[in-house]
UniProtKB/Swiss-Prot annotation:
This is Ribosomal protein uS12 methylthiotransferase RimO. Catalyzes the methylthiolation of an aspartic acid residue of ribosomal protein uS12. It comes from Helicobacter hepaticus (strain ATCC 51449 / 3B1). Gene3D superfamilies: Methylthiotransferase, N-terminal domain (3.40.50.12160), tm_1862 like domain (3.80.30.20). [4Fe-4S] cluster 2 binds at C151, C155, C158.
């Protein structure tokens, strides 16, 4: 008897970690396929796209064209995700080489679509729950858990509510079940994500949903580390910050994109909170022992004049965030900002970003130098992409892939013959030995 050879699958996940979770759900539905790193050899190619800002759209389109041009004869090309949701008609007309187009509603039906070689377009945005098996990408120790989809905020620059809809939270019980399932599979480090994490369960009538989650996770008494990403200023409270500070499971990690600090800009951007509120929240975060505060800013939004920029400049210089992402304003059709006047030109925007980056890089260097000589709790994640001779680690406090890397090039962990043991993913005590060219180097002292 001759058995049919398993078909091969190549998946490219673009954009944010929320998109990554959806990609992992698709892989969970397609476990009968053999994963291949070689696009040219794949029987099925899936590109889970991002369509948030212009650069993300261009990356998605270029990736689609590359896949179409380089796939083997007969290979199926599937395009999913935000770009596919926003521009279904345009993609069908302009890139007819795409075999299946599906947006953000049917990740759990990907196996049926491929089997039937046809698209499915449902109305309701998909939100993974504990019943959706995932194949976690890139780690056997860390996993993302998505709390909700959609957003009830009305930021002037953001198109997400147009294609992701209103806030749609999963239940507390669903979230806890997924956490427990992942823990039982061996995962120990978790990042909870959403478009607006601090509004979790508000659509279910719970104003303190995220605080309920923190208490419930603590009550599980699991030996884990966790952090919450994407807090929103107008839905974050001092009580929430205190809940995170007192938690035995959640780290004092505060990721709150504030986008600007000048009152005039916060109003123009429709952020729902003023400068005083932002400062109150940020100062409360800074008061938490061993805190880590991360944010993002948009530069060049309409009405950002020199006065507003200088106010932001001085604020960044004085507050010294642990991490900052800077984005040049990207016009999005259908948003309030798209029709606003007084947009700084590209040259001015780039100059402002360059000016701020100099401050930020100086602050990062100071943060890194302060770590040299310290012993820290870290998470080792495997071999580094910098070199096969280094292990890759991060402070336990840091988020995966976004906050930095420690290159481990020495270890005191040895066997009975005093031979250095191979290190596996997990918690370690690490001594930071050097900071060079923005890289931290460390020595593994013990497995925790």
């Amino acid at each position: 008897m001759r058995f049919r050879e398993r078909q091969s699958l190549h998946l490219i996940s673009l954009g944010c970690t929320k998109n990554l979770v959806d990609s992992e759900v698709m892989l969970g539905r397609l476990q009968s396929y053999t994963l291949t790193q070689e696009l040219e050899n794949a029987d099925v190619i899936i590109i889970n796209t991002c369509g948030f800002i212009e650069s993300a759209k261009q990356e998605s389109i270029q990736t689609i064209f590359h896949a179409s041009s380089n796939r083997k004869r007969g290979a199926l090309l599937v395009v999913s995700g935000c770009l596919a949701e926003r521009y279904t008609k345009e993609l069908k007309e302009e890139i007819p080489e795409i075999d299946i187009i599906t947006g953000v509603s049917d990740y759990d039906k990907i196996d049926s679509m491929i089997a039937q070689r046809r698209s499915i377009e449902s109305a309701k945005v998909f939100l993974a729950d504990e019943h959706n098996e995932r194949v976690i990408i890139g780690s056997s120790f860390h996993a993302y858990i998505k709390l909700s989809e959609g957003c009830n905020q009305a930021c002037s620059f953001c198109a997400i509510p147009q294609f992701k809809g209103k806030l749609h939270s999963r239940t507390l019980q669903s979230t806890l079940k997924e956490l427990t399932n992942l823990y039982n599979q061996g995962f120990r480090d978790f990042s909870f994500i959403a478009q607006d994490s601090s509004s979790y369960m508000r659509d279910l009538g719970q104003k303190d949903g995220l605080m309920q989650l923190i208490r419930a996770v603590d009550n599980l008494n699991l030996p884990i580390s966790a952090r919450i990403l994407y807090l929103y200023p107008s839905s974050t409270s001092l009580q929430l910050i205190e809940s995170i500070a007192q938690s035995k499971s959640f780290l004092p990690y505060f990721d709150m994109p504030i986008q600007h600090i000048a009152d005039a800009m916060l109003k123009t951007m429709r952020r729902g909170a003023d400068k005083a509120t932002h400062l109150e929240l940020l100062n409360a975060m800074r008061a938490v022992p061993h805190n880590f505060v991360r944010t993002s800013f948009i530069i060049g939004h309409p009405n950002e004049d020199e006065k507003a920029f200088l106010e932001l400049h001085d604020f960044i210089e004085s507050f010294a965030f642990d991490r900052i992402n800077l984005f040049a304003y990207s016009p999005q059709e259908g948003t309030a900002a798209d029709s606003m006047p007084n947009r700084p030109n590209t040259k001015i925007t780039n100059q402002r970003i360059n000016t701020l980056n100099k401050i930020i890089q100086s602050q990062y260097k100071a943060h890194n130098l302060a770590l040299v000589g310290q012993e820290v709790d870290a998470i080792l994640e495997g071999k580094s992409e910098v070199s096969e001779y280094f292990y890759k680690a991060r402070l336990k406090l840091w988020g995966k892939d976004i906050d930095g890397e420690i290159l481990i090039n020495d270890s005191e962990i040895v066997d009975s013959n005093n031979q250095m043991l191979l290190l596996k993913e997990g918690y370690y005590r690490v001594q930071i030995t050097q900071c060079k060219d923005n890289f931290l180097f460390g020595k593994a002292l013990s497995h925790l």
